[in-house]
Amino acid sequence: MDIIETAKLEEHLENQPSDPTNTYTRPTEPVEEENKNGNGKPKSLSSGLRKGTKKYPDYIQIAMPTESRNKFPLEWWKTGIAFIYAVFNLVLTTVMITVVHERVPPKELSPPLPDKFFDYIDRVKWAFSVSEINGIILVGLWITQWLFLRYKSIVGRRFCFIIGTLYLYRCITMYVTTLPVPGMHFQCAPKLNGDSQAKVQRILRLISGGGLSITGSHILCGDFLFSGHTVTLTLTYLFIKEYSPRHFWWYHLICWLLSAAGIICILVAHEHYTVDVIIAYYITTRLFWWYHSMANEKNLKVSLQTNFLSRAWWFPIFYFFEKNVQGSIPCCFSWPLSWPPGCFKSSCKKYSRVQKIGEDNEKST
C-alpha cells in the first residue's frame, strides 16, 4: 500500500502546474531598459562596484545613497580676494593718515581736548611700548594658531574681511573729523604742503614699519578716531578664543590679559583719547559678533524682510564668502604641510567589498 500511495503522489506532483508566484527568477531585462524604468544604478556608484557587478553577475545591485557635499569647502580663491581687500584698506589707511596729518592744527593753537581719564591718570612714557609689544605677541600667537587650523582658509577670509572693514571705517572717521593731539608731548612730523614725493615716502615708511612707534614709523598725527591699536588687540583676542578649544582656559586668560593690558596702556600713555578706545572696542566686537552669528546661523544668511542683519551694506560680500559654509566650523587642527608629499606616497590598489568577496569565492572553489 505504501508503494501505491507514493506512486500516486509522484504522479500528482508531475501533473501539477507550476506556480510562478512560488519561485524566483532573475530578471533578464537589460541595463538600458532598467535605466529607462528608473531601476538602474545611480551614477554615484563607485567604479569598483560597477566592475564587480560586471565580473560577478550573480550579485544583486543595491543603490547606495549619494555622498553629501562638503560642508566646509576651502575655496582658497575667496580667501585671496578677502586678503586683497584687507591689504587695500590697510594701505588706504596709511594714505589717509598722511592726508589728515596735513590738517591737524598745531597744539599751540588747538590744545588737547578735555579727557576724564587723563585728569586722574598721569602719563607713563613707556606704557605705549608695552601696548605695541602685547599687540605683536597676540598677532604672532594668532598667526601660529591659524596655520594649524584645519579650515584655515575659511577662518582666514573671515579675519581679512573683518579687519579690512574695520580699517575702512577708520579711514572714514579720521577723514571726516580731525581731532587735535591728545597731549602736549606729541612731536608730529612737519607738514609737507603739497610735496607729493615726500608724502609717498612717508606712506612707504608707515607700511614698512607697520605703523608702530617702536619701529619709528609712527611719526604722523591725526589718526585719533578711532584707535587702530585697540582694533588689533581686541580682534586678535576674539579670533584666538573663538577658534581654540574651550578647555584651553589658561590660554584664553593669558591672551585676555595681554589684550586688556595693552588697551589700558594706550590710555595710560595718553596716546589716544578715551573715546577713541571705546569706539574702537565697540565697533570691533559688534562686527565680529554680528558676522559670526550670521555665519553660524543658516536663517541669517538669507535676505528676508524680518532679517534686519541682512540690511548691512556688506551683506552681499558676506553672502559671497559664506554661502557654501554649512554651520559652525569645528575646532580641528592639522599640520600646515602634509608629509610625505603626495608625489612620494605609494599608490595602493583599492578593492570594493563586492570584488573582495567575489575573489574569495573564486579561491574557495
Swiss-Prot record:
GO terms for cellular component: endoplasmic reticulum membrane; Golgi membrane; plasma membrane. The active site is at H229, H272, D276. One of its GO terms (biological process) is regulation of bone mineralization. Palmitoylated on Cys-331, Cys-332, Cys-343 and Cys-348; which plays an important role in plasma membrane localization. Its EC number is 2.7.8.27. Residues 291-365 are cytoplasmic. Residues 15-26 have a biased composition (Polar residues). Residues 1-14 have a biased composition (Basic and acidic residues). One of its GO terms (molecular function) is sphingomyelin synthase activity. A lipid is attached at C331, C332, C343, C348 (S-palmitoyl cysteine). Keywords: Cell membrane, Golgi apparatus, Kinase, Lipid metabolism, Lipoprotein, Membrane, Palmitate, Sphingolipid metabolism, Transferase, Transmembrane, Transmembrane helix. InterPro entries: Sphingomyelin_synth-like (IPR045221), Sphingomyelin_synth-like_dom (IPR025749). Sphingomyelin synthase that primarily contributes to sphingomyelin synthesis and homeostasis at the plasma membrane. Catalyzes the reversible transfer of phosphocholine moiety in sphingomyelin biosynthesis: in the forward reaction transfers phosphocholine head group of phosphatidylcholine (PC) on to ceramide (CER) to form ceramide phosphocholine (sphingomyelin, SM) and diacylglycerol (DAG) as by-product, and in the reverse reaction transfers phosphocholine from SM to DAG to form PC and CER. The direction of the reaction appears to depend on the levels of CER and DAG in the plasma membrane. This is Phosphatidylcholine:ceramide cholinephosphotransferase 2.
